[in-house]
Amino acid sequence: CGTGMGIHIAASKCPHVHAGVVESVPAALRAITGNGVNVLAMGAFYVAPQMGCDIADAYLGASLGSGYEWWKNFYEFHKLAIDELEAFDYEAYKKNGFHVDKLGDYPLKLEVKPD
């Protein structure tokens, strides 16, 4: 796969797969810590073999919310988003005239990382 985009599109069609295209260690970390991706897609045009190994190692060593413990409710907010994705029913969405029913709210507040 040259860009990672094709496999990302294919994988994302499978139930419960949350794929992310990543080209760096920071992107992989954010993909898991903030978005809960469970499949990484990397393109050989942009990710060298050693970088791919570093990306995989970083991803495998992280989890949703890790590194953001200082940010109050970071995990809870992002978990809510993942749960909404998991609960999404495409057939009901189609029958509802492609209108998204709101599943929940979570209060947001800007947090500043302590020094």
Region roles according to the model:
Residues H18-A19, V39:
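Secondary-structure boundary/capping signal
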Residues V25-D115:
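C-terminal binding/interaction regions
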